[in-house]
Amino acid sequence: MEEYKALLDEKMDRVLLSLDSEYKSLRTGRISSALFDKVLVDYYGEKTPLTRVANISIPEARLIVIQPWDKSLLSKIEQAILSSDLSMNPSSDGSVLRIKVPVLTVERRKEIVKQAKKIAEEYKVAARNVRQELNNKAKKQEKDSQITEDDLRRILDDIQRDTNSYIKKIDEIFDLKTKEIMEF
């Protein structure tokens, strides 16, 4: 039974880490270079994360400066940002891109909250898939007479209780993210 608990914790922790990573790429009231983690630049025919081809700095509260390591990528980086869902317009001075980040409108914040909710639901599904995988493993062990029916019932109950706990954590993370997004 401890084997199931350890396996569940390991897989659910990965789900929570992935959710956290996904949420870092959502724009909130605070500016972060993590916003650009999912922006892919065409780098010699390969789609490469922006963070691997440029230095991203935030010298002021509402200003982002992107300095490519290879100046020939400047226009490709600009295109990648324009085609992303970040709603940002970079301006180039020939060597760096500057992005003045406007304050988010209430409507845009609500859109981002909807996006965060959708992401949270996807991760709840992932958590339920982990539960289903472990339930099937336990049922197979019972079918193969490796564990008793009582053990199976206990294992399934433990898996369900722990899954509910992880889904509650996903909801708490979503609530915190919503609060962060809606801050002015």
Curated annotation (Swiss-Prot):
Gene3D superfamilies in UniProt: 3.30.1360.40, Ribosome-recycling factor
Localization of this protein: Cytoplasm
Origin superkingdom: Bacteria
GO molecular function terms attached to this record: ribosomal large subunit binding
Cellular component annotations (GO), alphabetically ordered: cytoplasm
Keywords: Cytoplasm, Protein biosynthesis
GO biological process, one term: translational termination
Entry keyword annotation includes Cytoplasm: yes
UniProt cross-references to PANTHER family, sorted A to Z: MITOCHONDRIAL RIBOSOME RECYCLING FACTOR PSEUDO 1 (PTHR20982:SF3), RIBOSOME RECYCLING FACTOR (PTHR20982)
Biological role: Responsible for the release of ribosomes from messenger RNA at the termination of protein biosynthesis. May increase the efficiency of translation by recycling ribosomes from one round of translation to another.
HAMAP family per the UniProt record, alphabetical: RRF
Family: Belongs to the RRF family.
Name the UniProt record assigns to this protein: Ribosome-recycling factor
Species for this entry: Borrelia hermsii (strain HS1 / DAH)
